[in-house]
Amino acid sequence: MAAVITLIGATASGKTDLACALYQRFPLRLISVDSAQIYRGMDIGTAKPSAAFLKQYPHDLIDCCEPEEHYSAARFCQDAHQAIAKAHADGKIPLLVGGTMLYYHALFSGLSDLPPADAQLRAEIMAEMHTRGLPALYADLLAYDPEQANKIAANDTQRIIRFTELFRQTGQPPSALFAQQKQAAPTWNSLHLALLPERHLLHQAIAQRFQTMMAAGFLEEVARLKMRPKLTAEHSSMRSVGYRQLWRHLDGEIDLETAVELSIIATRQLAKRQITWLNNRLKTVLSMHFYDPYQAETPNRVFQQVAQFCKHNEGTFL
């Protein structure tokens, strides 16, 4: 059975550094699992590795599409399966690294047999949102699918639009579609590594990293993106943390200090959601080994575990 390793963790938990250290020691191929780093032109605010860094440590599934495009979990699964197959064909073990928990869940537990995104219908729904307002679309969702509506925030634009799209495509409530989920039996021998840092240390790292991003030109990056004629604040890419707050600043809604403060708060909230996924939904799908990334002995412990896994799987992926 072919081998796969995952390195999962919240934002700013040190996944990339550890993944690269593993890459130097073992026959691995790095595959990004990040719903923001897939977009071209979104570099600073996503903490995307530099071109020079990627030349030394190549990653699949970075810079896959334009920020105006819709990139779904279904598309990720398709792209990830191709990247994993290529790694195995090259005699490498794929190391999936990133913090988009939905992508991991979809890849290892399967997706509902949902219709693909419909660009024309989505454009119509977004136009309707601008005329009727997001609260009206959420009220509709509450009416035809209260179960799914109560699982999300009333201002969750991305999911409200997607659920509206699914309902209009199929005539069925999204919760009913998700209940029909087809489980895909894992086809890999997998090792799942999870980084779970102390909360206060993670919060410090998030704040420090965001200030570093600002000093590196994050605001200017958002300004360049804002000049793209077809890109709006409602696109999934621009709903990413940091981008939506700085976009609001550039629109004159909030001052820069407030935008930075809100961005750091939103990033901490994202990390909390990621950790909740790790401790709940993903634990029901994956058998994970947890490590504190801020403990000095963690890298060596991870190296030992990966070495044992590689030795056990020697020859099975060639």
UniProtKB/Swiss-Prot annotation:
Highest taxon in the source lineage: Bacteria
Any one GO MF annotation of this record = ATP binding
Task: Please provide the record's keywords in A-Z order.
Answer: ATP-binding, Magnesium, Nucleotide-binding, Transferase, tRNA processing
Per UniProt, substrate binds at 11-16
Q: What does this protein need as cofactor?
A: Mg(2+)
- Catalyses which reaction(s): adenosine(37) in tRNA + dimethylallyl diphosphate = N(6)-dimethylallyladenosine(37) in tRNA + diphosphate
SUPFAM superfamilies xrefs: P-loop containing nucleoside triphosphate hydrolases
Q: Which E.C. number(s) belong to this protein?
A: 2.5.1.75
Site features described as Interaction with substrate tRNA, chain residue numbers: 100, 122
Instruction: List every stretch annotated Interaction with substrate tRNA.
Output: 34-37, 158-162
BP-aspect Gene Ontology terms? tRNA modification
| Residue sites binding ATP per the record | 9-16
In the UniProt record, does the keyword Metal-binding occur?
no
Look up keyword Metal-binding and say if it applies: no
Could you tell me what this protein does? Answer: Catalyzes the transfer of a dimethylallyl group onto the adenine at position 37 in tRNAs that read codons beginning with uridine, leading to the formation of N6-(dimethylallyl)adenosine (i(6)A).
Q: How does it assemble?
A: Monomer.
- What's the family? Belongs to the IPP transferase family.
**Which protein are we looking at?**
tRNA dimethylallyltransferase
The species is: Dichelobacter nodosus (strain VCS1703A)
